[in-house]
Structure formats: structure tokens, C-alpha cells
């Protein structure tokens, strides 16, 4: 497996790999990573679909990319997906997955046209004082110490950031900046999250820094992630003969290690309460989704809070599988699951889905986001963060294009609400969010959009229906880590198995993205099948001086360098640098970026 960039490799079709007709594949998990592995086995590995078996414990494919309607309780959306135009592996896949809505076009075509006709951007990034615009005004408000610390983090080698928290590498002044408000709520970082992962994010998305304050960097699907991404992909695979075996609870993959040659020899599972095994030979490939950020999710509804009584650190079926595999390693080569799942108080947050068709509530929404959600276009353009809830629930909410579900009633609006802090009282509801019913969560949201306090309780009960989801491990992959804590996609010496998803290690890319999952699936197949075509490298904006200069300009709130708060010594050095680059291409680049007048 090798990386590539450019259209030569991107447009080419690989030859059929040697031995493809002898291969069979078993894929544990039908999240985006597992489905992507199946896709690449079919398209580029050219393995017959009938020889590819997806093993899924649940009765529905998609993993964390879900979206569903419970006929008794209402709509559930655990989360949403923010996409980037440089998700190279994602678009490589979806350009060949047919749309299930528009005949003759791909999912990528459909998505591309949608976001051209209806580009995403926010008209109110944050609110305060019960629905008033907080006027972040696209500014980052970085002080000098914070800006320098971010620059240093950008350039620090990953090895030097292992097991470090963000709070260990950034100054206290950073937490009061708009940059941190945008960053934390957009990506769900916490102060105790991995400094290594934050560095990856800075490097990965420096070309989008101008689009962070108003979300103009983002693109979204037409419907929820299940209907827009998972369903077309599953239908593509089924059309090629790939089978999805539901109710398969995989407990272990037995791996034999003989002098460094590692071979998966057996899959151990339960189905319908009965144990079973699948014996494997070297031509049987096994793709393992190790760990899951939505493991042991707990659901609530309008009248019931989520039941958290069964949540225990380290407990969860995906973690149990990974632990069973990791225990077989001789040198820790299958990762360290405990690093990610041993402190759910550090890794949880909670979301809610509010359903309403009430005109007065919708008018409150319109007053904040300046758009009518019933028009079927971008509404909030990303989350609206409630700035004065930072010491309480730290609430944000968003309305994506409506309807979010094809089954949604006309003129009904679905609002997705999430909170980074679940163990503190709300501003209005004097309970921790995790202890609240859907109705109580709705009250807090209604308060923050400006509903009069004497009407909040009635409106939450009679004009809305709210479901909730507490996810104990949703931020597990943000825990401080070493490179060795996640297994390589294909561990050294592995003959017929690979790891997939957010807890597999691949260079430079960032977790909590659709791209990361798909990339691991592609890399796994290309490595084990020896597909002779390049895997698209992570977009290289961190190596592009134009993007770096532009990022610097926006990070200092679009000030030329002669307006920055510099010391006398720094001003003298700057003057010398400007003189040295005079008449060169670098001077042109500095002027084009805005840093030089």
C-alpha cells in the first residue's frame, strides 16, 4: 500500500489483484469503516460479492451513522456529520455509489450539486441572553501568547505530544478566546483532550481556518447520515451480492503468531444466544472494527431520562472484543483499549432531538438564525452555541436542511441539541442534563432561544416531542494517547487481518470524521489485497505556504503584520525580513495573503 496525490492515480482503475478469486472476507461491524472495506473489496479488490460477509450485532447497518424514527417515541439522531471538500477517500468511494434518489448519478454528484446550489454558512454562530446574537463576528480574538502557543503546537512533533492534554500545551488565556469557543463546540474537544489530536486537526484543516467562524468550510448531506450515506452504500453492496448477517455478536478473533507471522484462524461469535465459530485459512480476510464511540448509548424520551445504571468504565461489547484481541499480543501491537474506555466521565456527552411544528417556536428560531427551516435549505448552517451556558450544560443546537427524514411530516422541524457537560445544572433547568427527561431538556433549549419563562414548561410539554441519548464513550478517541495505543490498520506481520475505524492508527488524519473511517477501510483492503493503486494521501495544506500564510492572516483577525502587537525587537526583525523578501515571490505571497500591505 502506498499513498498518492493527483488525478493520475485518482482516475486510474487498478488491475485485478493476484489471487482475488481465492479470497473470502469477513467484516466485523457495519459502520462506515466496515462498509467502506466491503466497497473497496468489490470495486478495487475485485472480490466476488458472494464471498464478502458483513457481521453485524444489531438489526440495522450503519454503526454510529444512524438516524431513525421510533413510532412510539419519535425521531432519534445521536449525532451529525460535517464534511470537507478534501475528504479524499470519501469522495473516491461515493463517486461510484449510485444515488437512490436521482437515477444515473452518484452520491457524490448529488451531494456536490446540493452544496453548490445551497452553500453552507451560519448567520449566528453563538447566542447569549436568551436568544440574542453573541456577536462573535467571525473573530478569533487570540492574544499573543495563545497565537504563539498554537503555532508551536502546529510544529511540535507528534512524539513529543504523546499522553499530553491540550491544557498542558496552551496558556490559560486561550480558554477565553473565540477560537476555543468555535473549536471546542465544533469538534467536541475538551481541555483534557489529546494535544496530539489537536495538532492533527490544526494541520489537517489549516486551509479552512477562514471558514471556522461561520461554518462556510462545511458541507452537509440532504437528509440524515443514514439515509444519505449508509443506505445507498448498503444497496450498492447488496447489488453486488455482498451479504449482511445481522444478529452476529462477535466476541473474539483468534490470532496465531508464529515467529512474527500473524494469522487470524477463527472468529468466535454468538447468534440468537448460541455460541459459534468460523474457522479461517490465510485466504480468508478479517476486518475488525475495534472500539465504538457510541457503545452502550442510553436513550431517553419525552417522559423518561436515559437509564445510566448499567454504565461502567471499560464496559461495552466493542471494548470487550478489542480487549480479547489485545490480550493475544506479544508486544502490545493490537493496541490498548483501556486508554480510551476507562473514564466515561471524561468521554461522555449527550444529545437530544426536538420535534416541533409550532409556529411561535419556529419564529423564535427564525429570529436567531435569520432563515425559515421549512424552506428546505440551510437553516442554522451549523451549531448555534449558547455562550452563557459554558459553565452549565454548555449547550449548542442546529437545524440541518429539512426534512431530515423522508418520513418526516410536512412543516415539522427537527432540532438537534447537544451538551458537552452533562453533570452540571442548566441555566433554567436546575438538574444535570443526564438526569433529565426529553421534556426537561427541551425546557432548557426553549429558555435559551428566548421563550418567555412563564410559557416554557407548557410549550416543552405540549408543543414539542424530545428524545435524548447519553453516550458515555462519544469522546473516547480524544483521550490523550501514544501512537501505540491504537493498532496499525494492518499490524506488522499480519497476513489476513486488519483493524478498522476510529481506533485504528493511520498517519496524519483526524478522528471523529467520516473520512477517517473510510480511509482505514481503503488502506486495509489495499494492503491485504495488494491493490496496485495509490491511496489518496491526507490533503497536504500544512505543506502549502500559501495556505499557511492565509491561515496566519485569518488567525490574527485579518490584520497585516505591521499592525500586530510586536515588541521593539520584533519590529526591527520584521523590518529586516520585509526588506529581505522585497522583489521576490515571497513578497507576492505575503501580499496575496493579506499579511503584507
What function would you assign to each model-found segment?
Residues 42-69:
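Glycine-rich FAD pyrophosphate-binding loop
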Residues 205-221, 283-285, 290-520, 526-540:
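C-terminal segments that line or cap access tunnels to active or ligand-binding sites in enzymes
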Residues 72-113:
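Conserved FAD-binding subdomain of flavin-dependent enzymes
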Residues 37-50, 236, 240:
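A short, Lys/Arg-enriched amphipathic alpha-helix followed by its capping loop at the start of a domain
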Residues 100-207, 219-220:
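Rossmann-like flavin
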Residues 203-285, 289-291, 303-304, 309-311, ...:
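Helical element adjacent to the flavin cofactor pocket in flavoenzyme catalytic cores
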Residues 1-25, 43-51, 555-563, 567-597:
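Extreme N-terminal leader/targeting segments of oxidoreductases
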Amino acid at each position: 500500500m502506498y499513498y498518492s496525490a493527483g488525478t493520475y492515480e485518482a482516475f486510474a482503475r487498478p488491475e485485478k489483484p493476484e489471487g482475488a478469486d481465492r479470497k473470502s472476507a469477513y467484516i466485523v461491524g457495519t459502520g462506515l469503516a466496515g462498509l467502506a472495506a466491503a466497497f473497496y473489496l468489490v470495486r478495487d479488490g475485485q472480490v466476488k460479492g458472494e464471498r464478502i460477509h458483513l457481521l453485524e450485532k444489531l438489526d440495522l447497518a450503519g454503526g454510529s451513522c444512524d438516524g431513525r424514527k421510533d413510532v412510539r417515541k419519535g425521531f432519534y439522531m445521536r449525532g451529525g456529520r460535517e464534511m470537507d471538500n478534501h475528504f479524499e477517500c470519501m469522495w473516491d468511494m461515493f463517486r461510484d455509489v449510485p444515488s437512490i434518489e436521482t437515477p444515473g448519478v452518484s452520491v457524490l454528484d448529488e451531494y456536490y450539486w446540493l452544496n453548490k446550489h445551497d452553500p453552507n454558512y451560519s448567520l449566528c454562530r453563538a447566542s447569549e441572553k436568551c436568544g440574542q446574537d453573541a456577536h462573535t463576528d467571525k473573530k478569533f480574538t487570540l492574544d499573543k501568547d495563545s497565537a504563539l502557543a498554537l503555532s508551536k503546537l502546529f510544529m511540535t512533533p507528534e512524539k513529543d505530544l504523546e499522553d499530553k492534554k491540550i491544557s498542558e500545551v496552551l496558556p490559560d488565556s486561550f480558554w477565553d478566546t473565540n477560537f476555543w469557543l468555535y473549536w471546542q463546540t465544533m469538534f467536541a474537544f475538551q481541555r483534557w483532550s489529546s494535544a496530539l489530536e489537536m495538532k492533527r486537526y490544526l494541520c489537517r484543516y489549516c486551509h479552512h481556518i477562514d471558514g471556522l467562524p461561520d461554518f462556510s468550510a462545511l458541507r452537509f448531506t440532504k437528509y440524515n447520515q443514514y439515509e444519505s450515506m449508509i443506505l445507498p452504500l448498503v444497496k450498492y453492496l447488496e447489488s453486488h451480492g455482498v451479504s449482511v448477517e445481522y444478529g452476529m455478536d462477535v466476541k473474539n478473533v483468534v490470532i496465531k503468531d508464529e515467529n512474527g507471522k500473524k494469522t487470524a484462524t477463527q472468529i468466535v461469535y454468538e447468534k440468537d444466544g448460541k455460541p459459534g465459530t468460523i474457522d479461517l485459512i490465510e485466504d480468508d480476510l478479517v476486518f475488525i472494527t475495534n472500539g465504538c464511540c457510541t457503545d452502550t448509548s442510553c436513550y431517553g424520551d419525552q417522559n423518561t431520562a436515559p437509564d445510566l445504571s448499567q454504565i461502567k468504565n471499560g464496559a461495552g461489547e466493542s471494548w470487550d472484543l478489542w480487549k480479547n484481541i489485545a490480550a493475544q499480543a506479544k508486544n502490545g501491537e493490537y493496541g490498548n483499549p483501556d486508554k480510551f474506555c476507562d473514564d466515561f466521565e471524561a468521554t461522555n456527552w449527550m444529545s437530544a432531538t426536538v420535534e416541533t411544528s409550532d409556529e411561535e417556536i419556529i419564529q423564535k428560531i427564525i429570529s436567531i438564525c435569520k432563515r425559515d427551516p421549512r424552506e428546505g435549505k440551510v437553516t442554522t448552517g451549523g451549531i448555534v452555541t449558547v455562550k452563557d451556558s459554558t459553565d452549565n450544560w454548555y449547550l449548542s443546537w442546529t437545524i440541518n436542511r429539512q426534512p431530515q427524514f423522508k418520513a418526516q411530516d410536512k412543516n415539522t422541524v427537527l432540532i438537534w441539541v447537544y451538551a458537552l457537560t452533562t453533570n452540571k445544572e442548566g441555566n433554567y433547568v436546575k438538574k444535570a442534563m443526564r438526569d433529565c427527561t426529553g421534556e426537561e431538556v427541551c425546557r432548557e433549549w426553549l429558555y435559551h432561544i428566548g421563550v418567555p419563562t412563564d410559557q416554557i414548561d407548557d410549550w416543552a410539554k405540549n408543543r414539542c416531542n424530545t428524545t435524548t441519548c447519553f453516550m458515555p464513550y462519544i469522546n473516547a478517541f480524544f483521550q490523550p494517547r501514544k501512537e501505540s495505543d491504537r493498532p496499525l490498520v494492518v499490524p506488522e506481520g499480519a497476513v489476513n487481518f486488519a483493524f478498522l475505524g476510529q481506533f485504528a492508527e493511520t498517519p496524519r488524519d483526524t478522528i471523529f470524521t467520516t473520512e477517517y473511517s473510510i480511509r482505514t477501510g481503503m488502506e486495509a483492503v489495499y494492503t491485504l489485497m495488494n491493490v496496485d493503486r495509490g491511496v489518496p494521501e491526507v490533503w497536504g495544506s500544512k505543506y502549502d505556504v500559501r495556505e499557511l500564510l492565509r491561515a496566519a492572516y485569518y488567525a490574527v483577525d485579518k490584520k497585516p503584520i505591521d499592525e500586530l502587537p510586536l515588541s521593539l525587537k520584533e519590529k526591527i526583525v520584521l523590518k529586516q525580513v520585509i526588506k529581505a523578501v522585497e522583489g521576490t515571490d515571497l513578497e507576492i505571497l505575503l501580499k496575496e495573503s493579506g499579511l503584507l500591505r
